[in-house]
Amino acid sequence: MTNIIVNSPLDQFDIKVFIGFVSPFIDLTNINITTFTVYSVFILIVILGLTLLTDNNGRIIGNRWYVSQEAMYDTINNMVSGQIGGKLGGYYFPLIYTFFIFIFTANLIGMIPYSFAITSHMVFIISLSVVIWLGVTIIGLYTHGLTFFALFVPAGCPLALAPLLVLIELLSYSARAISLGLRLSANTLSGHLLMVILGGLVFNLMSVSIVTFVLGFIPLAGILAIVALEFAIAMIQSYVFAILASGYIKDGLYLH
């Protein structure tokens, strides 16, 4: 039976196998149901459930779930309209909103004690950002052809500096494939490690004696403040991911 108790600060990031598949005919060693699989499906179920709860049954004023979903919808819609604009903004809005709501829900579920934070795994998030980067590059090449490479030539740059500036712009553009996901994953990973380590220290302090138990409430209040800050960061990072993805799409469409 899989142990779900966190024994060290890094245990919460460990991918555990729940069900493994074996076949005498083909190699299925890499096809397993893991914590990552379970939490990914659970996140999708939560998103679907919250979406179904937004049904206001024909009432003029919706329930609290409807209002919250509408607020997030309008926020992302306004952001995409401001970034991309026009009909193309409406075309790419579902994609950006999907990124936002999935990452936001995953971050909130990852805040539950003893849960598994899928956004802390750099392989997953960076893979997602690489796919976005490749998609934006393909969109740019399909829309503008060879003119797309004008994106790497700063306007009005001297001819003598053009090779150096083009190299810098090319490296900057290529780094987007990593930086988009690395920013989210690093913030999630560091925040969770900080809470677990500080929580463990306070727990050990409060376990020593009655005096340290009482004194432990002082750092415990600080940890609760950090937890509140992490909830805010969970929302901010999902919005930052969405706005950067939208900005990258804008660069591919308009070359600026």
From Swiss-Prot:
Which keywords belong to this entry?
ATP synthesis, CF(0), Hydrogen ion transport, Ion transport, Membrane, Mitochondrion, Mitochondrion inner membrane, Transmembrane, Transmembrane helix, Transport
Quote one Gene Ontology molecular function term: proton-transporting ATP synthase activity, rotational mechanism
Where do transmembrane segments lie in this chain? 33-53, 92-112, 122-142, 148-168, 191-211, 235-255
Q: Has keyword Kinase?
A: no
InterPro entries, from UniProt? ATP_synth_F0_asu, ATP_synth_F0_asu_AS, ATP_synth_F0_asu_bact/mt, F0_ATP_A_sf
Species for this entry: Wickerhamomyces canadensis (Yeast)
* Annotated compartments: Mitochondrion inner membrane
Q: Which Pfam families match?
A: ATP-synt_A
- Gene3D superfamilies per record: ATP synthase, F0 complex, subunit A
Membership in a protein family: Belongs to the ATPase A chain family.
PANTHER family to which the protein is assigned, alphabetical: ATP SYNTHASE SUBUNIT A (PTHR11410:SF0)
Q: Which GO terms describe its cellular component?
A: mitochondrial inner membrane; proton-transporting ATP synthase complex
Q: Which domain of life is it from?
A: Eukaryota
For this entry, the protein name equals: ATP synthase subunit a
Please report the record's description of how this protein sits within the membrane: Multi-pass membrane protein
Q: What does this protein do?
A: Mitochondrial membrane ATP synthase (F(1)F(0) ATP synthase or Complex V) produces ATP from ADP in the presence of a proton gradient across the membrane which is generated by electron transport complexes of the respiratory chain. F-type ATPases consist of two structural domains, F(1) - containing the extramembraneous catalytic core and F(0) - containing the membrane proton channel, linked together by a central stalk and a peripheral stalk. During catalysis, ATP synthesis in the catalytic domain of F(1) is coupled via a rotary mechanism of the central stalk subunits to proton translocation.
Self-association and partners: F-type ATPases have 2 components, CF(1) - the catalytic core - and CF(0) - the membrane proton channel. CF(1) has five subunits: alpha(3), beta(3), gamma(1), delta(1), epsilon(1). CF(0) has three main subunits: a, b and c.
Which gene codes for it?
Answer: ATP6
Tell me if Secreted is a UniProt keyword of this record: no
